[in-house]
């Protein structure tokens, strides 16, 4: 059996997307070759499911239908959609195998799109991010601010850091291990990046989704979807209409419990579609 997986994920220098090869290599032992959604065998961490929808453009639709025969198979592990409107229509791949999806919202939508009942775990594979650090660093910051890549240069992000006595601005475009280490050094996290929140959950760090702007792609679906896996209502803190949260408000806004996180880790490890190789930690 090959120890390389052909994986589709976004080509963006962003911690969330780059968790794909890191987690798959550390937890399951596979090297990862990044491929397009047309040729990849696995769709994992991220909001890539909409890429597999049948397109409305006739030329694109023809290309997809051909691809559905020439490369019919894709395994799906922990993925989701980015918009509510994405979860409509049907998939062009003829053999989509769903092992886990990001949340209950996506599970129900995929069931509707495929006409199949899915008895599978829900959760984002990024919840295994804590596996990437050999040891947990000591706490250095009372609060970490993790802007989405589109919010990095927003003056409101720098202003938010100044509102707290011991805060750290964390750049999701830095090396992912550096980003995870800095998140783990925080006692609380405020993030407009979904995977900033997921990483904090992975380390059992209280966190709160904050909104700086409308710049990030999506209509909030991916956040609603992620929290639906934990049966938690998504309640973002919009800094355009609310003052910066106090540390106690941020901590009180964290609804996910550590025992839920550990159970998701266990279920997602078990749901990975390929057996661990090369000393993967599974």
Please identify what each model-predicted range represents.
Residues 1-282:
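Active-site anion-handling motifs in enzyme catalytic cores
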